[in-house]
Amino acid sequence: MTMNKRILKYLFFVLLVSGCTLSNFVIEKTKAPSNMIRVAILRDVDTATIKALGPYVIFDTLSGQKLAEGRGQEIFLVSLADEGFRYGDNLFKTTKIRIVAQKDDPIFVGDRCYRGDISLVVTEEKKITIVNTLELEDYLKGVVPKEISDRWPLEAIKAQAIVARTYTLYIKKQKKYPFYDLTSDISSQVYGGQGAERYRTSLAVERTQGLILFYNKMILPAYYHAACGGLTEDVSELWGERLPPLKGGACAFCKESPHAFWKQNVRLKD
């Protein structure tokens, strides 16, 4: 397919930061078998506050049974009970519940609002993990502005959107976690929900919709970071996986970063 040369230019720089070259890459527009993404937005907490802005329904995820419904605008404190969840004045005797907005209104968890559904799960450690399930492209609109400035050239933001989309699908395929695909912090990639969205970053996501990086007919492990310090590591040294595009090397692009040069003093007895 034909790609705008400016996108390729900035994509090269994004990949350079990760130690990649463009040889043997294919950028394809594809539709994933499942385009729903599950993001852990809070992990292992004791309580949380939930507020739907519009009509909503709460389901028992395990049985599919409707547990409650409301008009929205109420703030509920959620905590653990002996037999499940205490949701405001309600007791839900299940270890998994799902909150579904009826009119695409966002749902607040704490002070952040999110598109899609919100699930609450009781973990083995008797804590609450909260998961936001939403469409891939909507998820990316909450990721890209947290990983690149919306003031950067649009083609650079579009390159970042392609890399973030590729990384998302690669990590999802690994099935690392039992009931979610990624976290919302730097353990995966930073996700700020609907409240983080910006016009230019959302535009970049929309204009690159479905574009994914492949290497040797496989989704590329598109690892990336804010700054490499001037030198990227061979991916085989980090994850034991040999992948020529991620072999690492010097990165002139990051030389202007304040993190490009650093020093650490170590005592002999250490």
Locate predicted features.
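Conserved, single-site charged/polar hotspot
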Residues: 3-270
